[in-house]
């Protein structure tokens, strides 16, 4: 893979991983576009390309850790405090908010995995169908537009329960389909469940950490089984990782800015325009 392609793919992953417009759809569309014009890059289903996509996803994981470092440190500290109190005295010392949130997050990831593994074959068919990608982009835009019409939400993380965690986990599972944005689905359904915008965002992006880690593990196993990594460009992997992480920090801060101001409909117009371009054949894809 040429370094300029690694930079381009890293930029796209970094921008669209957090903007609620589906990073997977953009990566798929860009990869098809590059291949259709005979640019030097591996096939999307090759072990090398799967590994590259895995690495840039880990890069965006670094973005989350950097942006939410204070909150993550607080969460880790108090979760360990809750766990220590339970191990030492057989009970929690005070309300176990952080331990409870940890368990709810794991529940969300569990339901994401159930949906993802159950519908994996269906989602893979969408990857090869630009018309289906266009449809899911239209749906993403509709959800974003509707979200800005919601009245102010009142629930905080203390009021988050099993039902909310399950709903968000299922929504994230369906977001594995190209065109359905992970951040959009989790934030929208968090708001639908009554969470305040700030907490819907924080839960969404905190949830991305174990989700990306689990997906990385599964993809690493797949890459190992495929083999054929002798031609992998380490320079391209490092470049994609660094670019995705750096661009992801800016992208994440941008989406938080718009979310807190109830302006997600800005992104709905973009995904509708992209869907229209696909349907009208303005984006020529070799499918």
Swiss-Prot record:
Entry keywords, A to Z: Antibiotic resistance, Cell inner membrane, Cell membrane, Cell shape, Cell wall biogenesis/degradation, Hydrolase, Membrane, Peptidoglycan synthesis, Transmembrane, Transmembrane helix
Catalyses which reaction(s): di-trans,octa-cis-undecaprenyl diphosphate + H2O = di-trans,octa-cis-undecaprenyl phosphate + phosphate + H(+)
The protein in question is named Undecaprenyl-diphosphatase
Q: Which family does it belong to?
A: Belongs to the UppP family.
Q: Offer a single GO CC term for the protein.
A: plasma membrane
Where exactly are the transmembrane stretches of this chain? 1-21, 49-69, 101-121, 126-146, 160-180, 203-223, 232-252, 267-287
Give a yes or no for keyword Hydrolase in this entry. Answer: yes
Q: Where in the cell is it found?
A: Cell inner membrane
- The gene behind this protein is uppP
* Misc: Bacitracin is thought to be involved in the inhibition of peptidoglycan synthesis by sequestering undecaprenyl diphosphate, thereby reducing the pool of lipid carrier available.
Give the species this sequence originates from: Halorhodospira halophila (strain DSM 244 / SL1) (Ectothiorhodospira halophila (strain DSM 244 / SL1))
Q: What is the top EC class of this enzyme, as a single word?
A: hydrolase
Q: Name one GO biological process term.
A: regulation of cell shape
Q: Which Pfam families match?
A: BacA (PF02673)
Physiological role: Catalyzes the dephosphorylation of undecaprenyl diphosphate (UPP). Confers resistance to bacitracin.
HAMAP family xrefs: Undec_diphosphatase (MF_01006)
Q: Name one GO molecular function term.
A: undecaprenyl-diphosphatase activity
Annotated membrane topology: Multi-pass membrane protein
Q: What is its EC number?
A: 3.6.1.27
